[in-house]
Amino acid sequence: MILIIRIFCTSLVISSFYTIQKAILTRDLDFKHIGIISIIAIVISSFVGILMAIYGYGVWSLVSINVINAIISLIIYYYYSQWRPSFSFSFSVLKEHFYFGYKLLLANLLDALFSNSSYVIIGKIYNSYTLGLFTRADGLRKMVVLGISTPLKSVLLPILSTIQGNEVKLKTIYIFVLQIALLLVTPLLLFLIVYADQIFNLLYGSKWDAAIPFFKILCLSSILYPLSTYVVSFLNVKGRSDLVLKIESIKKIALVIAFVITWITKDIYTLLWSLVIVSIIDFMINVIALNIVLKITYRFQIKKTVTALFINLCAISVLYIFLNIVFVDYTKSLLALAIGFVMLPILNFLFLYSINPKLIFQAKHIILNRDSNL
């Protein structure tokens, strides 16, 4: 096992040698080449891994996939990128980057430490059955939320870096991103809450029905999550890694309090609803941080957030009423799932157009002109 871990970890060392090349391509919004490199590396490493598995190499076939993926990526990144490391060293540059970077490192370490803490708490207080239900519900929730927010975040940071000195444009883009993020993520999460029964039965079967209430509350706790990730991008662009660390620290303190209360009450739903409260606290802290850095008033940020949430709630409410009128029990109908999947974005668009048509024209301008000038 020790040898396996040592060989497996070499992929991390190899990956560090093409971090700069990948960052440069990301800065230049060259996601085409990043995607091509990823596909080539995955195809080659997977092919080798499958061959090794066929010839009986067992766990080493899995190890080889990661190591070969890193090696292929390293070779191709050096081929595509013109940047090469020099053998000069500057303590002044190191000091500047270290002062900014160590706070981000601490914030990321805190996040990594607490990322799976819910599983540990549940495993200590409850049985493996409850832990399994929570893990299944949280896994599906993370797949959806991270699947949407992560790509948007990777595009957002390089765009912001080009206008970091323009306070007016940064404010405009933040308000635009705030609303778009809510209008993209919230409808999907509300859709998952309304159709949780059909989705779980379709994906996992009826044996996981007990995880559905967990899933609904976890989706509710994630509605404001994308905003937190995007706020970090804005703070990083302004060089305020100190605020990133403070936000992460306060959030973790709130989580610790939630864990203590859960430990005392021995109630799984106490933990779930505590996560909803923590997400609201996190949002309010982000509002304060953006007020400090970009001078956007609390009232204005909350007004835009509430407006976007109101549009989503109107759309999902109309859909919910319609489903209950048409179907005897929509939670058992796959046809209702298909109808909702089509109707919800249409309803969302109609409510958005009636309440905030300017946002639609801003999004259309960016898509057609491929720039950040709103």
What are the residue ranges of the model-derived segments?
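Helix-loop junctions and terminal segments of transmembrane helices
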Residues: T26-R27, A137, R141-V185, V232-V237
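Alpha-helical transmembrane segments of polytopic membrane transporters and translocases
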Residues: S11, I71, K103, S118-V120, ...
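Interfacial/gating helices of multi-pass transporter permease domains
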Residues: I2-L3, E96-F100, L104, I121-K142, ...
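Membrane-proximal transmembrane or re-entrant/amphipathic helices at the cytosolic face
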Residues: I296-Y298, V306, S317-L374
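Interhelical loop/hinge segments that connect adjacent transmembrane helices in multipass membrane
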Residues: K32, I75-N116, V120, K124-I125, ...
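Alpha-helical transmembrane segments of multi-pass membrane transport and lipid-handling proteins
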Residues: F47-L51, Y55, K171-P226, V256-I261, ...
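Helix-terminus/linker motif at the lipid-water interface of multi-pass membrane proteins
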Residues: A53, A112-M143, G147, P158-T162, ...
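Hydrophobic transmembrane helix module of multi-pass membrane transport proteins
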Residues: M1-N116, I321
